[in-house]
């Protein structure tokens, strides 16, 4: 740790990244990590600037990796160029997870649901160890304000619901 960090370990409005030490949030990190690891779905919300991203990056993500998970950060675009399912699949591929198909795609996977995609693949880290994707949707609430197509929203929520209720 450098001298500047020892003098003032807080970053103000900047967020912490994975691997950095976050001060004064040990209890929150412990509580949230236990909740995430024991539940299918967890919502972390709060005012802007209170440290949600820092807690995830510097606290939760390292613990998730130790638990056999790989964090997959997803910030959805709402411009209708790519549908949400394709964006989630792309984020999984971009996360560094290696994938192996354990079943063939039914229709060339063009209409494959998120549930089918997640269950048709096994996921591994770079060392070939089996891993579970931890899907983290950043700014998820934007879907309610930026996505004007109600059918698009409804279909995405249906797909997420199917995955979560498995």
Report each predicted region and the residues it spans.
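Amphipathic helix/helix-loop-helix segment enriched in hydrophobic residues with interspersed Lys/Arg
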Residues: 1-166
């Amino acid at each position: 740790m450098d001298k500047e960090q020892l003098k003032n370990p807080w970053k103000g409005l900047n967020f912490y990244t994975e691997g950095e030490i976050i001060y004064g949030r040990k209890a929150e990190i412990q509580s949230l990590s236990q909740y995430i690891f024991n539940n299918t779905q967890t919502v972390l919300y709060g005012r802007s600037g209170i440290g949600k991203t820092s807690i995830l990056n510097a606290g939760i993500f390292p613990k998730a990796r130790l638990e056999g998970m790989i964090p997959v950060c997803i910030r959805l675009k709402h411009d209708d160029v790519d549908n949400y399912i394709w964006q989630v699949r792309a984020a999984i591929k971009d996360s560094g997870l290696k994938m192996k198909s354990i079943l063939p795609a039914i229709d060339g996977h063009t209409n494959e649901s998120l549930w089918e995609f997640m269950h048709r693949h096994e996921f591994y880290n770079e060392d070939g160890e089996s891993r579970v994707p931890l899907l983290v949707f950043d700014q998820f609430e934007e879907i309610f304000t930026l996505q004007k197509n109600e059918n698009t929203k409804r279909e995405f929520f249906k797909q997420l619901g199917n995955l979560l209720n498995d």
